[in-house]
Amino acid sequence: MSLTEEIKKRRTFAIISHPDAGKTTITEQLLYFGGEIREAGTVKGKKSGTFAKSDWMDIEKQRGISVTSSVMQFDYAGKRVNILDTPGHEDFSEDTYRTLMAVDAAVMVVDSAKGIEAQTKKLFEVVKHRNIPVFTFINKLDRDGREPLELLEELEEVLGIASYPMNWPIGMGRAFEGLYDLHNKRLELYKGDERFASIEDGDQLFANNPFYEQVKEDIELLQEAGNDFSEQAILDGDLTPVFFGSALTNFGVQTFLDTFLEFAPEPHGHKTTEGNVVDPLTKDFSGFVFKIQANMDPKHRDRIAFVRIVSGEFERGMGVNLTRTGKGAKLSNVTQFMAESRENVTNAVAGDIIGVYDTGTYQVGDTLTVGKNKFEFEPLPTFTPEIFMKVSPKNVMKQKSFHKGIEQLVQEGAIQLYKNYQTGEYMLGAVGQLQFEVFKHRMEGEYNAEVVMTPMGKKTVRWISEDDLDQHMSSSRNILAKDRFDQPVFLFENDFALRWFADKYPDVTLEEKM
């Protein structure tokens, strides 16, 4: 098979949702259809002992939540599928946002009883900003939920995207009978031995069923007043195909997968800082690091840099340019993933995600190229933390483990590190409280380094240039610190303290990140 044909087989997407909408469960079912797991297990909390394949970190298994992005790959129906299962918890939106830079499409999972929730809306806005296609799976039809028409209306009003139902539920909860498949023009049956039936058989199968009569009325209304189906509008991110189903009972998931692969896009090009778009079919390899993960194998205290291949082909042992440093690197120890398990890979192509063993060479956002190509891809989003804690080792004899743990976990980008200019104290910044809990848990479990964490409350953060810096600017209402890149930064007590500082030093430029 030619390189072009291999690249065109790839389908790389992320699954996004609010916590508990069923995102990890649908991931399990997709892996089941891809033959990667023998049984799609229910995602449960710590008492059951049954863990999701994509939840590999110890704390994820204990709490039944996803706190880090997982990468999984399988072959299905002639396509090579790369799934990125992202954290649903809002505290880990930073990891999720960066992951969304590495995909060509998104699958949005919505709880049929709750509709569009806060985290779903936030993540959708990032996807919308990138104009990548969004496929919607409305989940949990095995439970009572809201009316389908009401859910479609909310999609359009809250998210501002047109929708087109690919199927329609027949009943819901205990009265759930199946799906009226508009795309494949058939019925998918929830009960009984037969999985499918013709639409012509519907009146006989559901005679005297009030739900089926309502379905026919809804579909007639949609055909008269709903949006037209347009493959181009889907690819442009202007129309979301909507699928109904139940991930828990594995109903409607395979139909979703088949139809998704029919319309999901091939790998797309990525913009450089100069505004050029790198074509995925270009033979020269290029890629970017969108994530760094420490201790995927706790026995080896390793670090993996996750790279999205943008163009060309990776071959084991190839030399690459690291544009940020201007230095070369050799890609010898490279893997692909099934959550925490991995296997060495000798080649991969545009659209694939590979893991490069990292000894501290790479940073999130790094561009890798070959030959004389020295461009950089557009930077990944960075976020200003909102809450802070001082951190120190509980046992001074564990200083070495403490520093190693902080260094590795900070390089993952899940938490940010600052050092007080005057005292040298370490301060951690996060988007949400759960990040601190995970940090503490991982420091103790993975590095055997207990930590003392002292809350500092919320702070308003602004960066300042070295040229403007004067240590006398520090006061009781702000803390002068350095970030992990040694850039000076002020942590202001509140917005009032920030305004007071800006009035006192009008010539000083204060920079805010995302």
Swiss-Prot record:
Gene3D superfamilies: P-loop containing nucleotide triphosphate hydrolases (3.40.50.300), Peptide chain release factor 3, domain III (3.30.70.3280), Translation factors (2.40.30.10). GTP binds at residues 17-24, 85-89, 139-142. Residues 8-268 form the tr-type G domain. GO terms for molecular function: GTP binding; GTPase activity; translation release factor activity, codon nonspecific; translation release factor activity, codon specific. It is found in: Cytoplasm. One of its GO terms (biological process) is regulation of translational termination. Belongs to the TRAFAC class translation factor GTPase superfamily. Classic translation factor GTPase family. PrfC subfamily. PANTHER family: PEPTIDE CHAIN RELEASE FACTOR RF3. This is Peptide chain release factor 3. It comes from Streptococcus pyogenes serotype M49 (strain NZ131).
